[in-house]
Amino acid sequence: METSKKHKIIKQISLFAENKPGRLANVANKLKSAGINIKAFTIAESGDFGIIRMVVDKSEYAYNVLHTSGFTVSETNVLGIEMKDLPGSMSHIAEVFGEAKINLEYAYAFVTRDQKALLIVRVNDIEAAIKTLEEENIKLIDMKELEKI
C-alpha cells in the first residue's frame, strides 16, 4: 500500500469482554488511568461475550495497556469518513460503496464538537475504498486529525 493511503487509515482497538455488568467500566477505567481518550466506540453482543470496538487518541498505547491488563485485544484498520450532519449523507456514502462493489462490514458514527459527522467503517477492500472516496471528493480523516477531535 502506498504511503499516502496508509496515512488515511485509522487503527481501531477491538477487544472481547464478558457480557456482564462492570466490564465496560473496567475497560474504560484502564484507559482513563493511562490518559487515553475514547473518541468513539460500539459494542456488539455475542452471547456471553461482547466485542468492544473503539477509536482512541493513542491506539498503540491503548493496545498495550489493555493487552497487559489481560484483555484479548486486536487492532483493525478502519477509515474515518467526514460527512455533513444532514439527512442523506449516510445514503450518499452507502451508494458510493455499493456502486464500487465495496462491502461495508460494519460502521459506527459520532458528531464532533464542531458539528461534523464522522463515520468509522471497516470495509472488505480498504485500498479500493480510499481510492473511491478520494475520487468522489469525500474527506477521510487520519489519526492525527482524530487525535485533535
Predicted regions located by residue number:
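A conserved regulatory-domain signal marking ACT and ACT-like small-molecule sensing domains
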Residues: 1-149
